[in-house]
Amino acid sequence: MEQAPENQGPQREPYNEWTLELLEELKSEAVRHFPRIWLHSLGQHIYKTYGDTWTGVEALIRILQQLLFIHFRIGCQHSRIGITRQRRARNGASRS
């Protein structure tokens, strides 16, 4: 029966270090796109809900990822990523 190899490959960074680095990257990106008061309020909400726990960190990461994804998908003014806004004919003449 096959067994998984033990400790082969490069050593992985500890989960908590990786998580905190990811959170810092997301926060620095979010500050470029959203008002600081919104982000501060989000942080306060997370802190009130989860306290100072890893669950709160994970929740904040998840929410920031979702906010940034939607922001870019809708069409950030600073980015080329997103939906291109096109004018549509009202009579449907552009449909094939």
Swiss-Prot record:
InterPro entries membership: RetroV_VpR/X
Broad class of where this protein is predominantly found: virion
Annotated positions of the Phosphoserine modification: S79, S94, S96
Keyword check for rRNA-binding: no
Region: Homooligomerization, residue numbers: 1-42
Modification after translation (UniProt): Phosphorylated on several residues by host. These phosphorylations regulate VPR activity for the nuclear import of the HIV-1 pre-integration complex.
Key words of the record: Activator, AIDS, Apoptosis, Cell cycle, Host G2/M cell cycle arrest by virus, Host nucleus, Host-virus interaction, Ion channel, Ion transport, Modulation of host cell cycle by virus, Phosphoprotein, Transcription, Transcription regulation, Transport, Viral penetration into host nucleus, Virion, Virus entry into host cell
Cellular compartment(s): Virion; Host nucleus; Host extracellular space
Domain of life: Viruses
Subunit structure as annotated in this protein's UniProt entry: Homooligomer, may form homodimer. Interacts with p6-gag region of the Pr55 Gag precursor protein through a (Leu-X-X)4 motif near the C-terminus of the P6gag protein. Interacts with host UNG. May interact with host RAD23A/HHR23A. Interacts with host VPRBP/DCAF1, leading to hijack the CUL4A-RBX1-DDB1-DCAF1/VPRBP complex, mediating ubiquitination of host proteins such as TERT and ZGPAT and arrest of the cell cycle in G2 phase.
Chain's role: During virus replication, may deplete host UNG protein, and incude G2-M cell cycle arrest. Acts by targeting specific host proteins for degradation by the 26S proteasome, through association with the cellular CUL4A-DDB1 E3 ligase complex by direct interaction with host VPRPB/DCAF-1. Cell cycle arrest reportedly occurs within hours of infection and is not blocked by antiviral agents, suggesting that it is initiated by the VPR carried into the virion. Additionally, VPR induces apoptosis in a cell cycle dependent manner suggesting that these two effects are mechanistically linked.
Protein's name according to its UniProt entry: Protein Vpr
Source organism of the structure: Human immunodeficiency virus type 1 group M subtype B (isolate SF33)
Gene designation: vpr
